[in-house]
UniProtKB/Swiss-Prot annotation:
Gene from which this protein is expressed: nadK
Keyword line: ATP-binding, Cytoplasm, Kinase, NAD, NADP, Nucleotide-binding, Transferase
Residues binding NAD(+): 60-61, 134-135, 145, 162, 164, 235
Species of the source: Treponema denticola (strain ATCC 35405 / DSM 14222 / CIP 103919 / JCM 8153 / KCTC 15104)
Protein name per UniProt: NAD kinase
GO MF terms held by the record: ATP binding; metal ion binding; NAD binding; NAD+ kinase activity
Length: 284
């Protein structure tokens, strides 16, 4: 390993101190490092692409930003949690040195997480394309939020959804906005999407789990809401127009992450989401 990118969240008060410690640790091992200061707003950093590792130093939002940059460049991500929740960033500040040493010595396994691809088409032309580690959300952003969406999967129509919006999440994103909206939680190794309506007009519009090998199409229909957007991981946003189409499929890119083993996933479900009601169940 020769060069490491450190994505530093400037919003975290203790991030700079830990960043200096990481820089010194890497320097002592003959590894160069470059610090990118992430402000929570920037979208596409202009960085070189010759990094061997990207260290995310912040909360889950910093991990999402780092993952979207790293995945197409095949750069592994080492996520250190400085946030309040830290469901994706499972490496705690007190653990970073030991975990990073394990990684450098080849003793830390990397686990792949799938991303979704969201292509926005207008008048039969692609205007922009994004990748998301968590989700793509189509919603009304004004006072009138109810929108109408024509949704199909592999050419099969699901009909018209009347709702405040819909969430299309990856297994990683199934623990986030989708779960808060009543969607199921998926194991990260499951190859699937979750389609979750947001405050649907009809009670029969329930969440759906769909194979990631397929393609979903979401078409914007006339509605009361005039301000409609698609949000990528809650960080990238595009305004939509009537008849725009969002094409969602599995991205060919995957992000390799440290500290994201199946064991850590289920530990996080218990400790951070209160799954099963207790982190230390007692058996009679």
């Amino acid at each position: 390993m020769k060069k490491v990118l450190i994505v530093l969240s400037i919003e975290k008060p203790n991030a700079k101190k830990i960043c200096k410690e990481i820089e010194a640790f890497l320097s002592a091992k003959g590894i160069d490092s470059f610090v990118y200061k992430y402000d929570g707003i920037s979208h596409s950093p202009e960085l070189n692409e010759d990094y061997d590792l990207a260290i995310s130093l912040g909360g889950d939002g910093t991990v999402l930003f780092t993952a979207r940059y790293s995945a197409p460049r095949h750069i592994p991500v080492f996520p250190i949690n400085l946030g309040r929740f830290g469901f994706i960033a499972n490496i705690e500040p007190k653990e970073w040195e030991g975990e990073l040493l394990h990684l450098l010595n080849g003793k830390q396994a990397l686990h792949k997480r799938m991303l979704l691809s969201a292509s926005i088409n207008r008048k039969n032309k692609e205007i922009v394309k994004y990748e998301a580690l968590n989700d793509a959300v189509v919603s009304g952003s004004g006072i009138a939020k109810l929108i109408n969406l024509d949704i199909s999967f592999n050419g099969i129509s699901f009909g018209v959804f009347r709702a405040d919006g819909v969430i299309v999440s990856t297994p990683t994103g199934s623990t986030a906005y989708s779960a808060a909206s009543g969607g199921p939680i998926l194991d990260p190794d499951v190859s699937a999407f979750v389609l979750t309506p947001i405050s649907p007009f009809s009670l029969s519009n329930r969440p759906l789990v769909l194979p990631s090998s397929g393609q979903m199409k979401i078409k914007i229909l006339p509605a009361r809401a005039k301000d409609i957007i698609v949000s990528i991981d809650g960080q990238e946003m595009v305004s939509l127009q009537e008849d725009d189409e969002i094409i969602i499929s599995e991205s060919p890119n995957k992000v390799k992450m440290a500290g994201c083993s199946p064991d850590n996933f289920y530990k996080a479900l218990r400790s951070k989401l209160g799954w099963s009601g207790s982190s230390s169940p007692k058996l009679n």
